[in-house]
Amino acid sequence: MTLSFVTRWRDELPETYTALSPTPLNNARLIWHNTELANTLSIPSSLFKNGAGVWGGEALLPGMSPLAQVYSGHQFGVWAGQLGDGRGILLGEQLLADGTTMDWHLKGAGLTPYSRMGDGRAVLRSTIRESLASEAMHYLGIPTTRALSIVTSDSPVYRETAEPGAMLMRVAPSHLRFGHFEHFYYRRESEKVRQLADFAIRHYWSHLEDDEDKYRLWFSDVVARTASLIAQWQTVGFAHGVMNTDNMSLLGLTLDYGPFGFLDDYEPGFICNHSDHQGRYSFDNQPAVALWNLQRLAQTLSPFVAVDALNEALDSYQQVLLTHYGERMRQKLGFMTEQKEDNALLNELFSLMARERSDYTRTFRMLSLTEQHSAASPLRDEFIDRAAFDDWFARYRGRLQQDEVSDSERQQLMQSVNPALVLRNWLAQRAIEAAEKGDMTELHRLHEALRNPFSDRDDDYVSRPPDWGKRLEVSCSS
């Protein structure tokens, strides 16, 4: 089958990119590809059998027109000016059978005009982390970019130490970022901001294109998508780590996996990025940061959208987030109805977990085994203060009984929203260390496991992290 590519970005937004081709690595070789995703995108299996090829930037497919995008942004709350694709190249936009498109973005593809002081490369460590994280999030049901392939090489790339150079093929319906809009707003080119908005509406919100109120309705939906995404992050214990405005997806996708982390111990102020000295991007601050970022996006639209309309959309953020978060947390607790004491029960559980540094994922998974008429629970052994747990658990079981639902029905619901497996940093690190020694077995094994996060397991993927894995420090270097 021949793949079809279109050039919408190149043709419609000529001042937002520089056209250039990838720079291949030395002795590049394909070490992993996403068979399921490739099948979904109708990619011929033969493309994965002829060396690095397009996956390593050594060849382009017919119709591809590679380019690096320019954007700007606020980093850690400070205006950083022009940024852009410093090591990534958008190879093309694949036209799918249903008329939608999928960006093929090659990360680690070499120097671009936006590389600044960087070398345009990515290392094997970071490409493995992003591939694992994006696929883990996808199978958790959270909107995200996807990973299609990883190529490693003999080219050394220097970070804290010399590491193998690598490339990741990332795919997404769009790589539109808040930072694209900021770039032209701060250059006082508001007409180009409007062109970006028109491009987004034309291709991703086409049902609004002929509405005279299209910009307000479109921005309201961007706010809603962002609020929904952040709510989902919070419910699974995901910390992004670097929520700069240039890392915010207009479509509400999880974008740019760097120093991310899933909670091990329940620690509301968890900071996964060791460069985040002030805790701006801590786990519990993510909802506030996302709103701040939306306010920066709204500012770029203010030359052609009424400020009252923008503020009205921003004002809806908290309620949308709380609604999504509340619905999912009630499901995680097994509540079939909404009762006034639900928030208090949840907050008391969180307080107990924080005091005891309970494992976030294991706690909710084990809670899924609760029988409403039995005081026995395997979760009890996870707590030192048994009396405090017993008190909470008795009131929790009383709440379950109000719903008049069988244990089996409720347990089935809870196990469908409380994963047994999340991508803990130590699991990724183990796969990385093996891959750096040339053994890809654990990389493939972990990828396969992450496809079924809600299935029961009895292996070390669902055990508590070892001592060495609890406080792994992760940086932005990639």
Curated annotation (Swiss-Prot):
Keywords: ATP-binding, Magnesium, Manganese, Metal-binding, Nucleotide-binding, Nucleotidyltransferase, Transferase. It comes from Escherichia coli O9:H4 (strain HS). ATP binds at G84, G86, R87, K107, D119, G120, R170, R177, D256. Belongs to the SELO family. Signal peptide: none annotated. Mg(2+) binds at N247, D256. Nucleotidyltransferase involved in the post-translational modification of proteins. It can catalyze the addition of adenosine monophosphate (AMP) or uridine monophosphate (UMP) to a protein, resulting in modifications known as AMPylation and UMPylation. It is an enzyme of class 2 (transferase). Its cofactor is Mg(2+); Mn(2+). GO terms for molecular function: AMPylase activity; ATP binding; magnesium ion binding. Its EC number is 2.7.7.-, 2.7.7.108. This is Protein nucleotidyltransferase YdiU. Transmembrane segments: none annotated. It catalyses: L-seryl-[protein] + ATP = 3-O-(5'-adenylyl)-L-seryl-[protein] + diphosphate; L-threonyl-[protein] + ATP = 3-O-(5'-adenylyl)-L-threonyl-[protein] + diphosphate; L-tyrosyl-[protein] + ATP = O-(5'-adenylyl)-L-tyrosyl-[protein] + diphosphate; L-histidyl-[protein] + UTP = N(tele)-(5'-uridylyl)-L-histidyl-[protein] + diphosphate. The active site is at D246 (proton acceptor).
